[in-house]
Design a protein with these regions (language model features):
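Helical mechanochemical/support elements of P-loop NTPase systems and associated helical scaffolds
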Residues: 3, 13, 50, 67, ...
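Long, non-coiled-coil amphipathic alpha-helical linker/lever segments
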Residues: 3-4, 82, 89-140
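Nucleotide-state sensing region of NTPase/ATPase domains
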Residues: 3-77, 83-89, 152-156
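Generic structural hydrophobic/aromatic packing signal, biased to beta-strands
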Residues: 7, 17, 32, 42, ...
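Short, surface-exposed, charged/polar-biased interaction segments
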Residues: 28, 74-75, 92, 99-106, ...
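Conserved NTP-handling cores and scaffolds of large molecular machines
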Residues: 65, 86-93, 104, 111, ...
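A structural signal for short hydrophobic/aromatic patches embedded in well-ordered alpha helices
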Residues: 81-82, 167
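Conserved NTPase motor "head" modules and their coupling/switch loops across ABC/AAA+ ATPases, GTPases
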Residues: 117-203
Length: 203
């Protein structure tokens, strides 16, 4: 793992890290002195303190490399992030996701079969898939809207109003605000439009 001495520039004997932060509406000066072969010194408002005394003094937001995948990776990662969060507050949502996966698998099986008698039942599966998909999409949209209320406020606060953030869930309806029924209809129409392409890819 990383060591404190890793902060020392190559060729230098020590490093001195200084910061100013606010705690309970009061500005606090912090300083850390690190020298090779010596104990680290932590100074708060000009007074040397122990490391334990600084725990909880500076509230930080940590960004790990894997967090960037929410932005840099494809929509599947973002959908999974939303689904995981939603399932924690709405356990029933997990059942809907599982049911959707089963219906989707059955639909794909029918397309692969190329059997006329089985393909004749495809529409009933499209209806089920669209209904579940409409519920899932609308639930994700609703959650994202609520999440953004806090996220936008937080970004505004930590950037002192210099940065703004926004996000929008893109669905087949193409609308920002919809109902589960509208999303269901949009998904059903999309399934019908993409039938030939789905058949070609899965066969």
């Amino acid at each position: 793992g990383a060591k404190d001495t890793d902060f020392i520039k190559q060729g230098s004997l020590f490093t001195d890290i200084k910061c100013v932060f606010e705690k309970s509406d009061r500005k606090v000066k912090g300083e850390i002195k690190i020298a090779d072969g010596r104990r680290k010194e932590i100074i708060k408002d000009g007074v040397k303190v122990r490391s334990a005394e600084m725990v909880g003094q500076i509230n930080t937001v940590l960004f790990y490399p894997e967090h960037l995948s929410l932005i840099k990776s494809g929509p599947e990662i973002r959908r999974k992030f939303l689904d995981t969060a939603i399932c924690q507050i709405k356990p029933g949502f997990f059942r809907i996701l599982n049911e959707y996966s089963k219906v989707l698998a059955q639909r794909n099986f029918l397309l692969k079969s190329q059997r006329k008698d089985m393909l004749e039942t495809l529409d009933s599966w499209d209806i089920k898939l669209a209904k579940l998909g409409g519920i899932i999409t609308n639930t994700r949209k609703t959650y994202l809207e609520k999440l953004l209320v806090f996220a936008e406020k937080t970004v505004d606060e930590i950037s002192s109003g210099k940065e703004k953030m926004t996000a929008e869930y893109q669905s087949y309806s193409g609308k920002k605000t919809t109902s589960a029924e509208e999303e269901e209809k949009a998904l059903y129409n999309k399934l019908k439009e993409s039938f030939s392409e789905d058949e070609r890819l899965l066969c």
